[in-house]
Amino acid sequence: MIGRITGILLEKNPPQIVVDTHGVGYEIDVPMSTFYGLPATGESLSLFTHLAIREDGHFLYGFASADERAAFRQLLKVSGIGARTALSVLSGLSVSDLAQAVALQETGRLVKIPGIGKKTAERLLLELRDKLGRALPGFGASTVPGAAAQPADSRSDILNALLALGYSDKEAQSALKAIPPETGVSDGIRQALKLLSKA
């Protein structure tokens, strides 16, 4: 199991990044919450990782904190929740917001996330109840130092990130129009997610 990766950030194409470690480029899918805090390409970073081995390949997922990875692993244990949906949940909610939603059994926050319907939200909350807190003994700690988000004037990155999260092209384009042109990619994705969650 690959539990941690430290290297140079080569590419950022949300939700996937490429990290070079001793000459090997690892493709890693990350939630938008982690993507927001990535350094600029060419700079070093360290991520907590989860390796999934399936018949169609090996897939690596990266997280800024151990808590985020623990939440991801708990989400994967919920019936009907795959890695893509788990990443969407962590892109739409912080770990603390997810824990709060689980504690209060709030389906409202979850159904705003692409790929999560009411029944899935109810099942997720039910199955995670009493589990999430135990899975996060160091809740709120263990964040990897990684640097602040860097500005990037690529509207296509914002659009691609929204499409990768499951939003339709129409929804993504609509949110994109409401964001000022000079907005950086990380801030743009964050603003778009807020706009879409209110829709």
Curated annotation (Swiss-Prot):
Task of the protein: The RuvA-RuvB-RuvC complex processes Holliday junction (HJ) DNA during genetic recombination and DNA repair, while the RuvA-RuvB complex plays an important role in the rescue of blocked DNA replication forks via replication fork reversal (RFR). RuvA specifically binds to HJ cruciform DNA, conferring on it an open structure. The RuvB hexamer acts as an ATP-dependent pump, pulling dsDNA into and through the RuvAB complex. HJ branch migration allows RuvC to scan DNA until it finds its consensus sequence, where it cleaves and resolves the cruciform DNA.
Domain of life where this protein originates: Bacteria
UniProt key word Lyase: no
DNA-binding found in the keyword field: yes
Similarity comment: Belongs to the RuvA family.
Record's protein name: Holliday junction branch migration complex subunit RuvA
Disulfide bonds listed in the record: none
Transmembrane portions of the chain: none
Highest classification ranks of the organism: Bacteria, Pseudomonadati, Pseudomonadota, Betaproteobacteria, Rhodocyclales
Record keywords: Cytoplasm, DNA damage, DNA recombination, DNA repair, DNA-binding
Subunit annotation: Homotetramer. Forms an RuvA(8)-RuvB(12)-Holliday junction (HJ) complex. HJ DNA is sandwiched between 2 RuvA tetramers; dsDNA enters through RuvA and exits via RuvB. An RuvB hexamer assembles on each DNA strand where it exits the tetramer. Each RuvB hexamer is contacted by two RuvA subunits (via domain III) on 2 adjacent RuvB subunits; this complex drives branch migration. In the full resolvosome a probable DNA-RuvA(4)-RuvB(12)-RuvC(2) complex forms which resolves the HJ.
Start and end residues of each stretch annotated as Domain III: 152-199
GO annotations of cellular component type: cytoplasm; Holliday junction helicase complex; Holliday junction resolvase complex
Source species: Aromatoleum aromaticum (strain DSM 19018 / LMG 30748 / EbN1)
Region (Flexible linker): 144-152
CDD domains: UBA_RuvA_C
SUPFAM superfamilies: DNA helicase RuvA subunit, C-terminal domain, Nucleic acid-binding proteins, RuvA domain 2-like
Pfam families the UniProt entry points to: HHH_5, RuvA_C, RuvA_N
Domains as described in the record: Has three domains with a flexible linker between the domains II and III and assumes an 'L' shape. Domain III is highly mobile and contacts RuvB.
